[in-house]
A protein has these predicted regions:
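Secretory/extracellular carbohydrate-interaction modules
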Residues: 647-716
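Extracellular glycan-recognition surfaces and repeat-rich motifs
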Residues: 616-655
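Right-handed parallel beta-helix
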Residues: 214-225, 255-266, 278-293, 306-321, ...
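Extracellular polysaccharide-degrading/modifying enzymes targeting complex plant/algal/animal polysaccharides
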Residues: 1-265, 531-541, 550-601
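Carbohydrate-binding surfaces in secreted/extracellular proteins
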Residues: 610, 685, 736-768
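Flexible glycan-contacting loops in extracellular carbohydrate-active proteins
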Residues: 763-794
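Predominantly extracellular beta-rich ligand-binding scaffolds that present long acidic/polar faces
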Residues: 1-4, 8, 429-550
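Short glycine/acidic-rich loop motifs that flank beta-strands on beta-rich extracellular proteins
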Residues: 227-233, 268-274, 292-298, 321-328, ...
Length: 807
């Protein structure tokens, strides 16, 4: 079309055309075991292998193990060297979790869950004898992802997992489709559709060549049944599932086009993607739901050809990420001057919205984006983490997050966070104003790091961890936080780093906790906090909300919020509007259930002599890192590694080498996450110092801020513990250490130390005080070298045990 002669494809009045990219499956028969089967000829002929099935208008579940929840990795193929490429292409599984005898094993897919993303990789082979699965693709370049947080995963497309109503399996060699019917379904009335197409509408322009598709309107149409692609090597980790560049409605090089009253449903990839070279387009009153990946995507991961000036308005986008959990409800990549307004975005397994696609302070590629008047809720579902109701990246002048209602943002417990509004790496120059945020796992507002954003006139309520979190100290103003109300059930209003008041502005805020404990301002009283120059015109007072527990934050007429200049926030113009049937549409859909809580991890025990690999008995490789530890060497892995230079027993030990010029004074270091919450914990190890070794050992809990229990440090050839004179250490000889401490309700706030020096009787120091009286739980046990010069120390025979057999 052209400006003078636009083209419209529209439904006739009173009609609703439906375009399907699938084909009905017919010829069903019931097997003796109650499974229904049908033959899919295109599969038997080797022409296609669909990855979705919809039965009677509902998404059926590909047979998986387990049906709910996850399996856990047993370990890495090479646990001593995380950089070993084999660790990206496989892992050790717990005996019985997988089986090499499973049918069509190379069609099985392993879906690994990380913090903010997932991978979906095909199986290459399963070695039962070694309990190792080899994958047909790599998890990706990030070494953290090979076993993130214990390595959650599930197995999909496995015939042996066909054991729950609503599950299905497609046998590739025979073309036989197996389906376990849901209660109430009839084989004579089944309406089963398998998608064959990946894209249902494609606008194919070429902006760089000046070939633009323009002035086309689609109105009153429904598009359903699109499949998702599976490369031969699978889908490695990529944030926002951004590498899956396809959608049911997919556009490149498109301008001045409109999607109006369009429904996209039952599809496998993203719903709608206006990608490279798409500008001045509009989506209005569209319904996008039941997608395998994201809902609506604008722009791309590259900045050219430019995509800009697109509008998504009054749209209902929900129940997305059904297959690819790390995708987003509405995603704006390297794209500017877009508007997302009056939308309802709900039921995602990850973030509701994401804006920007550059990490750090590079020149902006996503600016002047407006996110306003949206209702964003029930995201995360405890499936992933490091997420937000609204999530941003990079320098973003002119970008506004304004007048949004955000609530029920829940992450997978145990690591990272879910925040209502999350300004991630480099987020700069944003305005965050007039938002209501409540019921989040972690924080109402979080800044990882960024510069000069304005946070004002917001309500942040009922976050489980903190109202406001600032994660990093930098030599500039992070943000101004003024005129906000922070409302909590607990006293922990602030989390993170707040020791540098010259680098942030906090004033004219109102704080309130419904609990009995006084509010803590990052471990300080309000008076101590104000003495730093913060919040001098702020109040601690009950704002007088009408019914905050049920989401009504209307202020009473005499609310003290008026004293800080707070402007009341109306929720009347948030979310969908129009005819009653459209506005009430969300009432027809149930919220997706949250993932079940993970099983409590078994308390970590360690028996590490640095001689052999526990799972196989193979020799521990020189240079290998300590098992089950997190190691930080600032990309110099040789600084912590197994060495044959010295040993307290056997032939090898662990060498920790400092070079004195790393970016962080506490590096190199490594730590374990024991998860000991009760009973008595014993740590024993041997160490050997050089004359100028400088290091410490600490036990910490997982609080924010954390509390320290037992601590010992070594410097100047001496060992220091609280309340005791320094103890001379022999240089170049091995010393034995034993620490015993009761935890949880049994804690006496003290610990015992036994020190075995060569040629001396064991020295016992009892009832040494914990560094913090609040310490009760061992979540972090670390060894840190803090020298400002080149030196080293050795460790051997690390033993960690607990009398508590379960957490």
């Amino acid at each position: 079309g052209t400006e003078d002669a636009p083209i419209t494809y529209a439904a006739m009045p009173g009609e609703r055309p439906v375009f399907s990219g699938g084909r009905r499956v017919v010829g069903w028969r019931e097997e003796p075991d109650g499974i229904w089967t049908a033959r899919v000829s295109a599969v038997a002929a080797g022409a296609r292998y669909p990855r979705q099935l919809f039965v009677n208008g509902r998404r059926a579940t590909r047979a998986r193990i387990p049906n709910v929840g996850y399996l856990q990795l047993a370990g890495l193929i090479n646990p001593y060297d995380r950089s070993d490429e084999r660790n990206r292409w496989g892992f050790r599984f717990r005996p019985g979790d997988l089986s090499g005898s499973w049918r069509n094993s190379t069609d099985i897919e392993i879906v690994k869950m990380f913090s903010w993303s997932t991978t979906r990789l095909p199986v290459s082979s399963i070695d039962d004898a070694a309990s190792v699965v080899h994958l047909g693709g790599s998890t990706g370049p990030d070494p953290r992802l090979i076993d993130w947080a214990g390595g959650r995963y599930y197995v999909e497309n496995v015939f042996e997992g066909l054991d729950r109503p609503g599950e299905w399996y497609l046998d590739r060699p025979t073309g036989t489709l197996y389906y376990m019917p849901r209660p109430g379904e009839s084989i004579d009335e089944i309406d089963a559709v398998m998608p064959l197409l990946e894209r249902l509408v494609e606008f194919r322009g070429h902006a760089a060549a000046g070939e633009i598709v323009g002035h086309i309107t689609l109105r009153g149409l429904t598009f359903e049944h699109a499949d998702w692609p599976m490369p031969a090597t699978g889908w490695p980790e990529r944030q926002a599932q951004s590498s899956m560049e396809t959608a049911a409605i997919y556009a490149r090089g498109v301008e001045h086009c409109t999607l109006e009253d369009i429904e996209v449903r039952h599809v496998g990839a993203h719903g709608v993607w206006l990608e490279r070279g798409c500008s001045y387009n509009r989506m209005e009153r569209c319904h996008v739901w039941d997608t395998g990946a994201g809902g609506v995507y604008l722009g791309a991961t590259t900045a050219t050809p430019e995509a800009s000036h697109n509008v998504v308005h009054n749209c209902y986008i929900h129940h997305c990420t059904e297959v690819h959990g790390g995708a987003i409800g509405v995603w704006i990549g390297r794209s500017s001057y877009n508007e997302i307004s009056r939308c309802e975005i709900a039921d995602m397994n990850y973030s509701g919205m994401s804006v920007g696609w550059s990490w750090g302070y590079a020149e902006s590629t996503a600016h002047h984006n407006i996110v306003a008047d949206n209702h964003i809720h029930h995201c995360g579902h405890r499936a992933l983490s490091d997420m937000g109701g609204i999530y941003t990246l990079g320098v973003a002048p002119g970008t506004e997050l304004r007048h949004n209602l955000i609530h029920d943002i829940w992450c997978y417990p145990g690591y990272s966070h879910a925040s209502g509004i999350y300004l991630d790496e480099g987020s700069t120059g944003l305005l965050v104003e007039d938002n209501i945020v409540y019921r989040c796992t972690s924080n109402g507002f979080l800044l990882h790091y960024g510069r000069e954003s304005t946070i004002r006139n917001n309500i942040l309520a009922f976050s489980e961890r903190n109202g406001v979190h600032r994660a990093r100290v930098e030599e500039h103003i992070s943000f101004s936080f003024e005129g906000n109300i922070v409302y909590s059930e607990h006293p922990f209003i602030l989390g993170g780093r707040w020791d540098d008041p010259e680098h942030y502005v906090m004033d004219r805020n109102l704080y309130w906790s419904t609990g009995e404990a006084p509010i803590s301002f990052a471990g300080r009283t309000f008076e101590e906090w104000q003495a730093m120059g913060n919040d001098r015109d702020s109040l601690i007072a009950n704002p007088g909300f009408r019914d905050p527990e049920h989401g009504d934050f209307t202020l009473a007429g005499d609310s003290p919020a008026a004293q800080i200049g707070f402007e009341p926030i109306s929720m009347a113009d948030i979310g969908l509007y129009g005819d009653p049937a459209w506005v009430s549409l969300p009432e027809r859909f149930e919220h997706q259930p949250d993932d079940p809580p993970p099983p409590a991890p078994e308390p970590l025990t360690i028996s590490e002599d640095f001689e052999t690999l526990p799972l196989t008995g193979e020799p521990a490789p020189l240079g290998g890192h300590p098992l089950r530890a997190v190691v930080n060497t600032e990309d110099r892995p040789e600084l912590v590694g197994i060495s044959d230079e010295q040993a307290a027993s056997g032939r090898q030990s662990l060498r920790v080498q400092d070079v004195g010029d790393l970016g962080r004074s506490y590096n190199p270091h490594f730590y374990y996450t024991p998860g000991h919450a009760a009973g008595t914990t014993r740590l024993a190890f041997d160490f050997r110092i050089e004359k100028d070794s400088v290091w410490f050992l600490e036990w910490r809990d997982g609080g924010h801020p954390y509390h320290i229990g037992p601590r010992l440090s070594v410097s100047d050839g001496k060992l220091t513990v609280p309340g005791q004179p320094p103890i001379e250490l022999p240089v170049g000889e091995w010393v034995g250490v034993e620490i015993i401490a009761a935890l949880g309700d049994d804690s006496a706030g003290a610990w015992d130390l036994a020190l075995s020096l060569p040629g001396q009787a064991t020295r016992k120091l009892q009832k040494l005080p914990n560094n913090h009286k609040e310490f009760r739980k061992l979540d972090w046990l670390g060894f840190c070298s803090t020298a400002d010069h080149a030196t080293a120390f050795h460790l051997d025979n690390i033993e960690l045990s607990t009398t508590r057999s379960e957490p």
